[in-house]
Amino acid sequence: MAKKNRLNTTQRKTLRQKEDEYIENLKTKIDEYDPKITKAKFFKDLPISDPTLKGLRESSFIKLTEIQADSIPVSLQGHDVLAAAKTGSGKTLAFLVPVIEKLYREKWTEFDGLGALIISPTRELAMQIYEVLTKIGSHTSFSAGLVIGGKDVKFELERISRINILIGTPGRILQHLDQAVGLNTSNLQMLVLDEADRCLDMGFKKTLDAIVSTLSPSRQTLLFSATQSQSVADLARLSLTDYKTVGTHDVMDGSVNKEASTPETLQQFYIEVPLADKLDILFSFIKSHLKCKMIVFLSSSKQVHFVYETFRKMQPGISLMHLHGRQKQRARTETLDKFNRAQQVCLFATDVVARGIDFPAVDWVVQVDCPEDVDTYIHRVGRCARYGKKGKSLIMLTPQEQEAFLKRLNARKIEPGKLNIKQSKKKSIKPQLQSLLFKDPELKYLGQKAFISYVRSIYVQKDKQVFKFDELPTEEFAYSLGLPGAPKIKMKGMKTIEQAKERKNAPRQLAFLSKANEDGEVIEDKSKQPRTKYDKMFERKNQTILSEHYLNITKAQAQEDEDDDFISVKRKDHEINEAELPALTLPTSRRAQKKALSKKASLASKGNASKLIFDDEGEAHPVYELEDEEEFHKRGDAEVQKTEFLTKESAVMADIDNIDKQVAKEKKQEKKRKRLEAMRREMEAAMEEEISGDEEEGKTVAYLGTGNLSDDMSDGDMPDSEGHLKKKARTVDYSHGHNPSNSVDDDIIEVEEPQTLEDLESLTAKLIQG
């Protein structure tokens, strides 16, 4: 291959000057641009660089949305932005374009370190932002990185120092800020918080505060979300300086956006459904919309898992998928890819995909469980009707939830229409669920966990006017899930639940370092650490139907009149305290070690083994015990004892001798029986050979007896050698002039069966004489 033509020094200098002039001209256009006077409709109308425009054009981003036209010019001018817009309005491009342009104007390289930090509440949203960034920034030289949970931390640590644009979730970003040596945020240019209110709702407030405190105060900050809340306003006070609000009125002033936050092309409906009939209605809805692409939202991952497993076994006629936060990252990514490519599919999901995720061509969004607030409702229904396309949403409200929640929707200018259920389309699946749960204990366990998670979700809701815990029909709801009854539930306080949420989202490394002493050393509890792989195997807890949680759920209530004898004993103080054990150390000398480890030497030092027997009282005695002389004389005279002992032992020996004789006799008879059986088989084989040979030569054979050897021979008459066997059968030769073929009667010689040896000799002589 020919070498590429390299630019000389003069040419490179000229190229740099042109680039500097282009960037200065671009900055001038940005400063002169007034969005109030000039309302841009296309990306090319904005003062952005050619590489960015080329990437946008290749990705088919031509026309600006309302939020993009309002926020991008303000962000390009360097202002902090607090933005809110409808779902599906293009908020991702609204902050990615300013990020790329900021670094381009600053001539950012990989040696300058981290230039922009983008924080997303969920892994799926972070992955989507990263994919969009790689498309529109394909003609720039910036390096981008994605850091989320479920990925290899060491792999990320090795490369994070060379990244210019970092995208990730709050927990993993804070972990890298604590651990990564080469990650320097002192020169950070931009910070972007996507779905900021969701980050706060998920318990990331302390994590976000810790991240913001480590960043440069001279940075530019962008906060984006489809909804704004008071918590976002509080975060804006801490993170933003002299910020501009785009697409929303200031929440801190108490004003409310009069325009509805849902897309205009979205058709919204609701139905009033009793809690016990929700699964019946859901299954009937899926059966009647087999040609659609839909997302079904439930309140917890346990419910998603249960509904997916049961509906999958009932086969509604459409592809089913499920996605929730407890899945592995690889499974979540594969599910998202399959759902995006499919055209007719139903996805059961939690709120982990309710925000920001761009699902193409979703026809229906079904909310089986009532969302916690109107903002969550807006984000859920925003998964369809994106970018001006049509879509439909349906929410199922119980009679207890309907009135209060509809008032909250109407206050936000959202007025869904009411739908009536056709009884002909409704199908009850309660018998099928009961049959499935009866056959499969694991499904029953999933149903119990789904019941508990739903009841707890209602208990922890803040809006008690919508979620009335005391009016829940628990028995009917348990029956609708296929359960025989409502499981026991232990409720925790709200403070405990908030603390558990914070512990769940807290970085594990920080929790580990919190156990360090004054010297910074972490002393681990060795008693809780498995020593070998076998210890790990035995200490591993079962997560299926045999788990401890399952046993606690299914434990029957103890009867009050139960007998006191039936007591369940719990073992206590079973852990061995190492301080109480003696010091077991090997000797220092090699000879002593060899002697201690040698089995032969250790046995020699222990002496001879002794055999013990135990009496009825459980006391041990040697097999042979010697009596004292006094005890011996107490039983009588020595000669008398000797005579009694000999008589007793003689009787015992006589009985044993009789048994031995009987055993010997049986063995002898068995041996003789086997020998006779072998002789019979040999005689029969020999006779068959002689018969076949004589028939071939045309000779007549005379048989003695009945013709059956087993009937003719008895045990007493059986000879002992093979020589006598051949004398039992005789071959008669008629070659002396008598032709056996002349008559049939001539071939038969009738004789009486010989009884003695003399009879046999007489018969032989007669046969010889003819």
UniProtKB/Swiss-Prot annotation:
ATP-dependent RNA helicase required for ribosome biogenesis. Involved in the release of U14 snoRNA in pre-ribosomal complexes. Required for pre-rRNA cleavage at site A2. It is found in: Nucleus, Nucleolus. Its main location: nucleus. SMART domains: DEXDc, DUF4217, HELICc. The keyword Isomerase does not apply. GO terms for molecular function: ATP binding; ATP hydrolysis activity; ATP-dependent activity, acting on RNA; identical protein binding; RNA binding; RNA helicase activity. Residues 278-437 form the Helicase C-terminal domain. Present with 7900 molecules/cell in log phase SD medium. CDD domains: DEADc_DDX10, SF2_C_DEAD. A motif (Q motif) lies at residues 41-69. Residues 705-724 are annotated as: Disordered. Belongs to the DEAD box helicase family. DDX10/DBP4 subfamily. This is ATP-dependent RNA helicase HCA4. Its EC number is 3.6.4.13. Changing S225A: Lethal and prevents release of U14 snoRNA from pre-ribosomes. ATP binds at A85, K86, T87, G88, S89, G90, K91, T92. GO terms for biological process: maturation of SSU-rRNA; rRNA processing. GO terms for cellular component: nucleolus; nucleus; small-subunit processome. A motif (DEAD box) lies at residues 194-197. Disulfide bonds: none annotated. Keywords: ATP-binding, Helicase, Hydrolase, Nucleotide-binding, Nucleus, Phosphoprotein, Ribosome biogenesis, RNA-binding, rRNA processing. The keyword rRNA processing applies. The modification Phosphoserine is found at S692, S710, S714, S743. The gene is HCA4. It catalyses: ATP + H2O = ADP + phosphate + H(+).
